[in-house]
Structures are given as structure tokens and as C-alpha cells.
């Protein structure tokens, strides 16, 4: 959660769930009820619970497998899919976390592939709300992973 004060007497709360999703209305109402209680907030403050701004990104890459790999193409694909899922979960797990393709490349290279040609995402700075602006959260769009085949070392 991020709290900021865009103007005097106003407090905006931005809630992100543990899995990186935007909070449901039920959760936002519970947060508002807890933070808007007269015993918790200053009398003149107006508390609001708002959604962070989603910044959509796509993942597109081609990966290449070493010809002498001991892993089958099915095993490599499963490892690549798992690495992408881990990246997506990490990427949306915190408000203001920059979209960082280097992290994706690192995760992919640990799967046993030889190399990856990453087309998207590109590095994108996201706002964390610390400057009293609406915080942003990354939201994955399409994922296109292409096996480019085998290559010699």
C-alpha cells in the first residue's frame, strides 16, 4: 500500500494485493473503514482509497537452445514458461517497480537456453507515489515466446 497527500487535508491510499492485482471493492472498503475511523485519522482529513495506474507491457522474445543440450525441447519450454511466470509475478508485485527486461533475461538464461533475443518489454520507469502522484503498477498484456531452434555452442 502507498499513502500520499496530493493536497492539504487529503490522504489517498493505493492498495495492491500480494499477487499484484488491484484490490477488489470489498478490500478497498475494508481499508477505508479501518483508516477512516474517527479514532485513527485527523478530524479534518478526507481519506480515499484509489486504484494505482496500470502500465501495460508485452513480452516478446525468441530463445535458442544449445545443440548439445541434455534437456528436451519440452523441458526447455516448461522452464522458459516458468521463468516468464516468475518474472510477471515479480514485476507486478510492488507499486512503482520499474519494468526491467534485464530481470527477465536473467531468469530466462537460467533455464538452460543458449541465448534470448528480447523484443519487449523495454525498460520503463514507473512512479511509486512518493511524490504525491498516483503510483503505477506493471500489468502484463500478451506473452509471445518463440523457440528459435538449436544452435551450436
Model-found features: residue ranges?
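An aromatic-glycine-centered, glycine-rich loop/turn in mixed alpha/beta architecture
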Residues: 77-153
Amino acid at each position: 500500500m502507498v499513502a500520499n497527500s496530493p493536497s492539504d487535508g487529503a490522504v489517498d491510499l493505493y492498495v495492491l494485493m500480494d499477487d499484484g492485482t488491484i484490490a477488489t471493492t470489498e478490500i478497498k472498503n475494508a481499508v477505508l473503514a479501518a483508516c477512516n475511523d474517527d479514532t485513527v485519522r485527523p478530524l479534518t482529513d478526507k481519506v480515499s482509497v484509489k486504484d494505482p495506474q496500470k502500465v501495460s507491457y508485452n513480452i516478446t522474445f525468441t530463445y535458442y537452445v544449445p545443440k548439445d543440450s541434455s534437456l528436451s525441447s519440452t523441458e526447455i519450454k516448461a522452464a522458459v514458461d516458468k521463468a516468464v511466470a516468475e518474472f510477471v509475478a515479480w514485476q507486478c508485485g510492488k507499486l512503482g517497480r520499474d519494468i526491467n527486461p534485464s530481470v527477465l533475461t536473467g531468469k530466462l538464461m537460467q533455464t538452460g537456453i543458449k541465448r534470448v533475443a528480447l523484443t519487449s518489454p523495454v525498460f520503463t520507469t514507473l512512479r511509486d507515489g512518493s511524490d504525491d502522484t498516483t503510483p503505477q503498477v506493471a500489468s502484463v498484456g500478451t506473452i509471445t515466446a518463440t523457440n528459435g531452434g538449436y544452435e551450436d555452442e
